[in-house]
Design a protein with these regions (language model features):
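Hydrophobic face of alpha-helices
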Residues: 11, 110-113, 184
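A generic alpha-helix surface/boundary motif
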Residues: 76, 185, 269-270
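Short, acidic (Asp/Glu-rich) active-site segment that either coordinates a divalent metal cofactor
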Residues: 54, 145, 158-210, 246
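Glycine-/charge-enriched secondary-structure boundary and capping motifs
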Residues: 1, 16, 108-126, 139-146, ...
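Short loop/turn motifs at secondary-structure junctions
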Residues: 89-91, 186, 233, 318
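Short, acidic Gly/Pro/Ser/Thr-rich loop/turn segments
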Residues: 7, 43-45, 57-60, 155-158, ...
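Glycine-rich phosphate/pyrophosphate-binding loop regions near the starts of catalytic domains
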Residues: 16-177
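N-terminal amphipathic/basic leader segments beginning at the initiator methionine
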Residues: 1-25
């Protein structure tokens, strides 16, 4: 059966983490049937629009379980959530999480929530509530999965997206911290299943163990990109997740424009070339699966690129101009293309 007492102990251990994310608009505390967020915060907007996003972390959770390291996977979850929200210009207000597990281990669950709370604090949003569901018989005792949702708001006439993008705009790449939370099924197949590598294997090219590299937390860009939008004119942003750089970039362009990304403007981190070489993965396949070192792309007037790079550098993010937007040849042409070859470090 379900261990009610273990669930209660897990809630007790996560309360301090949740409290650390509290925004002034949050009403009440943890443990009620619903979380409350004071909607009068919408009063500061002329025409408020709510934005919401739901996501998970895919099979990266299998690495966390194998390594018995559980706080980073919660951080990953929030990165996947709030950075899908910020690309439309929305400020994330709160996150709710869902953890399904075979058996409630209070320490493990509290560590997952610790990571969620840390990323919420980084993004400036509250962890408003969540659910921990014990599923004995469906999941093994050590197994769990995490998912969540986030809600925020944006001024109607400040929504970013295809309607703002113009011919002649420049593309600003913002570096990823590594794989982030996409492509782990491919990575696990290539390096663990096929090559027979172990997570405790020290990999010289990486300068650390394989497991440490694979658990590198997803970058949470939200507060930094919102700061950028407040200082520099931005037309659209693309969160590079499942599907890779070209596919995600095409989603934020109008039908009559194409984004051309120049690979020679950056060198992917060693983990990307390692997966490609060890697995003999083709360039199209690797680029359609992994972010290749770019976590975000900002579409903006070329005149503002230098200022944007400076703003992001001041916030600890590496960024560079990686391409441009031009007229699309026809409806059958792709919305984004990658050209040239990556420079070698």
């Amino acid at each position: 059966g379900v261990d009610i007492e273990a669930g209660e102990r897990a809630v007790d251990r996560m309360k301090a983490h949740v409290a650390a994310t509290r925004r002034p608009e949050v009403l009440g505390g943890l443990g009620g049937f619903a979380g409350f967020f004071d909607a009068s915060a919408l009063g500061k907007y002329r025409h408020p629009v709510l934005a919401t996003s739901t996501d998970g972390v895919g099979t990266k959770v299998a690495i966390a379980q194998a390594m018995d390291v559980h706080d980073t996977i919660g951080f990953d979850l929030v990165g996947m959530l709030v950075d899908d929200l910020v690309v439309v210009g929305a400020e994330p207000w709160f996150v709710t999480d869902y953890i399904a597990c075979g058996r409630v281990d209070p320490n493990r669950i509290a560590n997952v929530v610790k990571g969620i709370a840390a990323a919420c604090a980084k993004a400036g949003c509250s962890l408003l509530g969540g659910e921990t569901a014990e599923h004995p018989g469906l999941l093994a005792p050590e197994e769990y999965d995490v998912a969540g949702a986030t809600t925020g708001a944006v001024e109607y006439d400040e929504i970013l997206g295809p309607q703002r993008v113009q011919e002649g705009d420049a593309l600003l790449a913002v570096a990823s911290s590594g794989l982030h939370s996409n492509g782990y099924s491919l990575v696990r197949k290539v390096l663990l299943a096929d090559a027979g590598w172990t997570l405790d294997r020290h990999v010289d090219e990486l300068g650390r163990t394989l497991g440490e590299e694979l658990l590198e937390p997803t970058t949470v860009y939200a507060s930094d990109l919102l700061a950028l939008v407040r200082q520099v004119e931005v037309h659209a942003m693309s969160h590079v997740t499942g599907g890779g750089l070209a596919n995600n970039l095409a989603r934020v362009l109008p039908d009559d424009l194409v984004a051309t990304v120049d690979r020679s403007t950056w060198t992917p981190a060693p983990i990307f070339t390692l997966v490609q070489q060890v697995g003999d993965v083709s360039q199209p396949d690797i680029e359609a699966t992994l972010n290749m070192g770019v976590g975000m792309v900002v579409v903006m007037p070329e005149a503002n690129i230098s200022e944007a790079i400076e703003v992001l550098a001041g916030r600890g993010l590496s960024a560079w101009q990686c391409g441009h937007v031009s007229r699309r040849g026809g409806p059958d042409e792709p919305g984004a293309v990658l050209v040239s070859s990556h420079s070698r470090s």
